[in-house]
Amino acid sequence: MRYTDMAARYFAVEDEGGHRIGNVMYYNLDRSRGEAEIGISIGARDAWGKGYGSDAMRTAARYVLSTVDLKRLYLRTLDWNERAQRAFQKAGFVAYGSSFREGHKFILMEFRREWL
């Protein structure tokens, strides 16, 4: 049986003016496998398409993998969300598979510590 650390860690995403526009979080921490899931939400629509998401994901991934004893971070994004997939690729994440959940197809992506 595998146990995961359900505690999540959140980081605020701010624009150049210091206004909070979203969050990056990691969760589903599995120390035995050396991995955690990472996600992002940029809620301020006027901040979309300006690179905040990819910059925040790249910064968070590098920070987490250099300060927490993990080998990789992974994420899931809906297969039709090509905008998010491009942002994650720009941040250094690489697609490695797909999965289905509740009738939806997800693209699986990862960022490994050895890529730092």
Task: State each model region's role.
Residues M1-A12:
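A short helix-loop-beta-strand connector motif used in the catalytic cores of GNAT acetyltransferases and
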Residues Y10, D15-L116:
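Acyl-donor (CoA/ACP) binding surface of acyl/acetyltransferases
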